[in-house]
A protein has these predicted regions:
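Residue-level recognition of alpha-helix termini/interfacial anchor residues
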Residues: 28-39, 43, 73, 216-225, ...
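Short, mixed-charge, low-aromatic patches
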Residues: 43-54, 146-153, 180-186, 222-232
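N-terminal mature-domain "stem" immediately C-terminal to a signal peptide or N-terminal signal-anchor/transmembrane
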Residues: 1-55, 59
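Acidic/His-rich structured neighborhood in mature extracellular/periplasmic domains
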Residues: 57-215
């Protein structure tokens, strides 16, 4: 297994002091020439060349008490004091990706402070993990910035799945020319099925970012869920409101039931992909991911809950 070492940009960032801010910023640019400009521009929203404004804004960002950034930074150092297990879990995930796709080059990974802006940040060369988005579902300052249903995945142990799934969505992009719900949910469901194979020691609800109760509700009501979708002929609809209702995060999936968790369409896509692989044992994971015909997958899956 190839060991991944996460770069602790967060630690260096928290060593910035107001009295020496200009020098400290220069040091950050020197030590992190690839990540620092991206963090300044994409996370803080400050033009990288505007050093005067950055020297003024950075201490405010680090010491803010209105949104709780100062308290959050201290909490982040506590929660992420030891990241050995985190690095091991991510290493395991990417080792399995490389087994499936040997050409995979593992990006450099950075742990950073996002100001509650970004759990996972990507470009072609690196991955950033917004540590302040994973301080625990019960972290008090989350009440100010997120909805209750979003807190479920704001835990340190959710990071490996978030990183690997984000990487797969980026490297295995949606290529279908169709935009029906069926196509979208099969694409996303296939990716989550693959993530579940990579982290085969995790229960399904952890992969989905749900509670165990939410997962069990879907399993117990799977037939009724499918009947609702089919009766409404939602699979073949292309309206954005329908697609977002089934695929986006939310407190529930209103298209089906107030009791159905958000992103229910992705779960259905996963279940169809799982059934497809069960009934077509000669198909490899790589072939599943490369198959862009959602109608074909649905028909050959023999999915009938």
């Amino acid at each position: 297994m190839q060991a991944i070492e996460i770069v602790r940009f967060d630690n260096s960032l928290l060593n910035v002091h107001e009295a020496s801010v200009a020098q400290d910023i220069r040091v950050l640019y020197e030590e992190y020439p690839d990540f620092m400009p991206l963090w300044v521009e994409d996370i803080l929203g400050i033009p990288s060349a505007d050093t005067a404004y950055l020297e003024e804004a950075l201490p405010e960002f680090l010491n803010d008490t209105v949104y709780g950034f100062k308290q959050t930074n201290a909490k982040e150092q506590e929660v992420f004091a030891d990241i050995t297990d985190l690095q091991h879990a991510i290493s395991k995930g990417f080792t399995r990706i490389q087994h499936l796709y040997p050409e995979t080059e593992i990006p450099t990974m950075y742990l950073f402070i996002s100001g509650f802006n970004a759990p996972v940040y990507f470009n072609d060369e690196l991955i950033g993990i917004g540590a302040d988005m994973y301080l625990g579902s019960d972290y008090e300052y989350y009440n100010r910035v997120v909805y209750e249903y979003q807190k479920q995945t704001m835990r340190k142990e959710c990071i490996p799945v978030d990183v690997v799934s984000a990487y797969l969505f980026r490297t295995l992009p949606y290529t279908s020319t169709k935009s029906r719900l069926l196509d979208q949910m099969l694409y996303r469901g296939k990716v989550m099925y693959l993530v579940a194979q990579i982290f085969d020691d995790l229960p399904g609800y952890e992969v989905m970012g749900w509670t165990k109760e939410q997962w069990n509700w879907c399993v117990q009501n799977e037939r009724a869920i499918w009947h609702v979708v089919m009766d409404k002929r939602d699979l073949f609809k292309t309206e954005s409101l329908i697609l977002t209702g089934y695929l986006n995060d939310g407190p529930f999936t209103s298209e089906v039931s107030q009791d159905a968790p958000g992103r229910l369409g992705i779960w259905l896509g996963w279940r169809i992909a799982e059934s497809y692989m069960t009934h077509n044992e000669d198909v490899t994971l790589q072939e599943l991911m490369a198959e862009g015909d959602a109608q074909k997958i649905l028909e050959l899956s023999l999915y009938k809950p």
